Design a protein with these regions (language model features):
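Short amphipathic alpha-helical interaction patches enriched in hydrophobic/aromatic residues
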Residues: 12-16, 35, 54-62, 79, ...
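An active-site-proximal "capping" alpha-helix that borders the catalytic cofactor pocket
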Residues: 27, 66-81
Length: 187
């Protein structure tokens, strides 16, 4: 297997900011917090965390194709070209395809990625990520944050993730309430 991690990091950095390498770094940090002493394939999770959103990057995105589906397509080609073993590719693709579905019938690696990705959309960081997607549309950012606040906690699988989410949800509620108050509802 000839995987150049520096190349992967560079490609994530090329996309940039909160949707590229910084999001990936937060996910990997969250995985260390929620994994506890659980045994999992660290290498596969590292690769999946870096590749899971590539299908949403302008370089690889396809209009009308879900970013997780497209990310799996891109990752499969990328990993195959570099001699990654089929079993490892299959595990990484499972992680990527299911990283935002909440499907409980998955490997621990897929659950770790899904939970960490969800947690990164909660709390202050999550709200700011939603608002950054629509800087000229406050209502759009607000509605996206409110929807994630309702949906994501139901998708979390691990107790460690649910514990982390509790504090992030309180933070999110405080921020959204302050936003409502500060805008007088005019947004």
């Amino acid at each position: 297997m000839d995987i150049d991690k520096d190349e992967i990091i560079r490609l994530c950095e090329e996309y940039g900011g909160e949707w590229g390498i910084n999001h990936t770094r937060r996910i990997l940090h969250l995985i260390t917090l929620i994994a506890g002493g659980k045994q999992y394939d660290i290498e596969a999770v590292w690769l999946a965390a870096h590749l899971h959103d590539w299908g949403g990057y302008p370089k690889w995105a396809k209009p009308g194709v879900d970013h997780a589906v497209r990310s799996a397509e891109v990752a499969e080609g990328f990993l195959s070209e570099r001699g990654c073993p089929k079993a490892t590719i299959d595990l990484i693709l499972e992680c990527i395809r299911s990283h935002h579905t909440g499907d409980p019938a998955r490997s621990l690696e897929a659950i770790l990625l899904s939970d960490a990705d969800g947690l990164d959309f909660l709390g202050t960081v999550g709200v700011l990520r939603d608002f950054s997607k629509a800087p000229l549309d406050l209502r759009g950012g607000y509605n996206a944050a409110k929807k994630r606040r309702e949906v994501i906690p139901k998708l979390l699988c691990l107790e460690e993730s649910k514990d982390l989410a509790a504090a992030r949800l309180m933070e999110m509620d405080e921020l959204l309430t302050a936003f409502e108050r500060g805008t007088f509802g005019y947004f």
